[in-house]
UniProtKB/Swiss-Prot annotation:
UniProt family annotation: Belongs to the class-II pyridoxal-phosphate-dependent aminotransferase family. BioF subfamily.
Cofactor (UniProt): pyridoxal 5'-phosphate
Protein name (database record): 8-amino-7-oxononanoate synthase 1
Source organism of this protein record: Bacillus velezensis (strain DSM 23117 / BGSC 10A6 / LMG 26770 / FZB42) (Bacillus amyloliquefaciens subsp. plantarum)
Cited NCBIfam families: bioF, gly_Cac_T_rel, PRK06939.1
Length: 391
């Protein structure tokens, strides 16, 4: 057998099914427009909701930290890699999320893996929304707990599962705060109400809600006025926050336990000084410059309204994630490719990221987009969709 022949066969099948994707290379800093293959294109695919990736305050904080503390830390947190700034960031995150404590992980993905794999045992059950992020799914797979999946945001189905799982040590309901492929918000008040009625715990992944929802971007828990009633909040520092990493926030007991049992935290080198300092500065920007969130929502409302007027089919998004439903993988890829040739970077999302036949162009609006950029992007989308007979 040729080396990895079985892998090549699978890759060939992906190409045949139009689910193969070529990574596009960006040649400038992230922003409302970027350069791809030497051409300036409007960026509608990044998670840089507030434009903080290139905010002068974050860039300057990163520069200062690198010059003073070096390029890296040289150790894991539990041995010799905890700098003063790491503790400062965690205190700031805990205050921001209105919890007793917080712990920073190397990524949002490893945060979910670390939390779920460490706190769940064979005595427990984890109850997960069917459209939760891949990191939640993989985190659950690492546990010995029983697993149940409830239909997407279906509270009757969630209650059915809760009623049938009364004999476990802990029942943990896990949900995305904002669902990344559709842009809808979890019905968190209803989830919390059921959890309290059936003595269950709640964990919310606010990857796409931190910096977007709630006062100053505190997330879905704060958005719904549920501070103190959700047991575990996780999120990223790489989307609206604009840098890198993930975090868990909750009680002091939870965070102390994760420090000792969270394997991704225990066995990964701590974040470089530049990354940590930029994250600290990002939280300060959220607290001190609310105009970024205001502009984000203004741009989102404008863009959605114009797409609907075109006759395009959108998901029931409630956030700056604005997916245009296409259906067939080949058509979604064709539209994405055509948009790029005309100056709009809007990535297609196909199987296995979404279900087969549910392919889409997922656009994400940011605070940095100007009206002129949005209008230009809208015109390109309109003409390309018409050319491909999608409207």
């Amino acid at each position: 057998m040729k080396e990895f022949e079985f892998l090549k066969a699978e890759l060939d099948k992906m190409k045949e099914n139009k689910t193969w994707q070529q990574m596009k290379q960006i040649e400038t800093k992230q922003g409302p427009s970027v350069e791809v293959k030497g051409e300036n294109v409007i960026q509608l695919s990044s998670n840089n909701y507030l434009g903080l990736t290139s905010h002068p305050r974050l860039v300057e904080a990163a520069k200062r930290a690198a010059e003073e503390f070096g390029a890296g830390t040289g150790s894991v947190r539990t041995i010799a890699g905890t700098f003063t700034m790491h503790n400062e960031l965690e205190k700031k995150l805990a205050n921001f999320k209105k919890t007793e404590a917080a712990l920073v992980f190397q990524s949002g993905f490893t945060t979910n893996q670390g939390v779920l794999s460490s706190i769940l045992t064979k005595e427990d059950i984890v109850i997960s929304d069917e459209l939760n992020h891949a990191s939640i799914i993989d985190g659950i797979r690492l546990t010995k707990a029983d697993k149940k999946v409830y239909r997407h945001v279906d509270m009757d189905d969630l209650e059915r599962v809760l009623k049938k799982s009364m004999n476990y040590r802990m029942r943990l309901i896990v949900t995305d705060g904002v669902f990344s492929m559709d842009g809808n918000i979890a019905p968190l008040p209803d989830i919390v109400k059921l959890a309290e009625a059936y003595d269950a715990f709640v964990m919310v992944d606010d990857a796409h809600a931190s910096g977007v929802l709630g006062k100053n971007g505190r997330g879905t828990v704060n958005h719904f006025g549920l501070d103190g009633r959700v047991h575990i909040q996780v999120g990223t520092l790489s989307k609206a926050i604009g840098v890198l990493g993930g975090y868990a926030a909750g009680s002091q007991v939870l965070i102390d336990y994760l420090r000792h049992k969270g394997r991704p935290f225990l066995f990964s080198t701590s974040h470089p000084p530049a990354v940590t300092a930029a994250c600290i500065e990002a939280i300060d920007v959220l607290l001190e410059e609310p105009e970024h969130m205001e502009k984000l929502w203004e741009n989102t409302a404008y863009f959605k309204d114009k797409l609907v007027q075109m006759g395009l089919t959108l998901t029931k998004s409630e956030t700056p994630i604005v997916p245009i439903l296409i259906g067939e993988e080949e058509k979604a890829q064709a539209l994405s490719d055509l948009l790029l040739t005309r100056g709009v970077f809007a990535q297609s999302i196909v199987y296995p990221t979404v279900a087969q036949g549910k392919a889409r162009i997922r656009t994400i609006i940011t605070a940095e987009h100007t009206n002129e950029e949005l209008d230009r992007a809208l015109e390109v989308i309109r003409s390309a969709a018409k050319e491909l007979q999608l409207v």
